[in-house]
Amino acid sequence: MAQSINITELNLPQLEMLKNQLDQEVEFLSTSIAQLKVVQTKYVEAKDCLNVLNKSNEGKELLVPLTSSMYVPGKLHDVEHVLIDVGTGYYVEKTAEDAKDFFKRKIDFLTKQMEKIQPALQEKHAMKQAVMEMMSQKIQQLTALGAAQATAKA
């Protein structure tokens, strides 16, 4: 369990170190959420593409991607089955309905993961804000102390 730190007892360099650590944690959590959103978007797009697979589109011509910028002409001859990339180079054949369920489960899982990370991110933001406010107070105190000492010497 993480230990509790009273930030009022920390000096300016310690507060700076704590702020830097919180910056790194906020960056990590933000990056994690962004990556999860990218993957989730891919699953949403894949699920939406399954709506094109219906009997009225069977036999229609289409462009099949060979790379991200190269396509070959093809015909849609099976609207009942699809191959799904399940990771690490493995593909599974599923019916269009099973594929929709698969993508829905993936989307829901990623949504739950983002919902778990979001509170931690908000907590780190709040902690960082508190540290920055304390740093500002300490700097003001040091400035006032320096001004008082300068006035006393004069």
From Swiss-Prot:
UniProt keyword Electron transport present: no
Molecular functions per Gene Ontology: amyloid-beta binding; transcription corepressor activity; unfolded protein binding
Gene Ontology annotations for the cellular component aspect, listed alphabetically: cytoplasm; cytosol; intermediate filament cytoskeleton; nucleus; prefoldin complex
Swiss-Prot/TrEMBL GO biological process terms: chaperone-mediated protein folding; negative regulation of amyloid fibril formation; negative regulation of canonical Wnt signaling pathway; negative regulation of DNA-templated transcription; protein folding; regulation of DNA-templated transcription; retina development in camera-type eye; RNA polymerase I assembly
Tissue specificity field: Highly expressed in pancreas and skeletal muscle and moderately in other tissues.
Gene3D superfamilies: 1.10.287.370
Superkingdom of origin organism: Eukaryota
Pfam families in the record: Prefoldin
Residues with N-acetylalanine modification: A2
Keyword line: Acetylation, Chaperone, Cytoplasm, Nucleus, Phosphoprotein
UniProt modified residues of type N6-acetyllysine: K42
Entry keyword annotation includes Ligase: no
Modified residues annotated as Phosphoserine in this record: S56
Family: Belongs to the prefoldin subunit alpha family.
Oligomeric form and interacting partners: Heterohexamer of two PFD-alpha type and four PFD-beta type subunits. Binds to MYC; interacts with its N-terminal domain.
HAMAP family per the UniProt record, alphabetical: PfdA
Function in brief: Binds specifically to cytosolic chaperonin (c-CPN) and transfers target proteins to it. Binds to nascent polypeptide chain and promotes folding in an environment in which there are many competing pathways for nonnative proteins. Represses the transcriptional activity of MYC.
Protein name: Prefoldin subunit 5
Source lineage: Eukaryota, Metazoa, Chordata, Craniata, Vertebrata
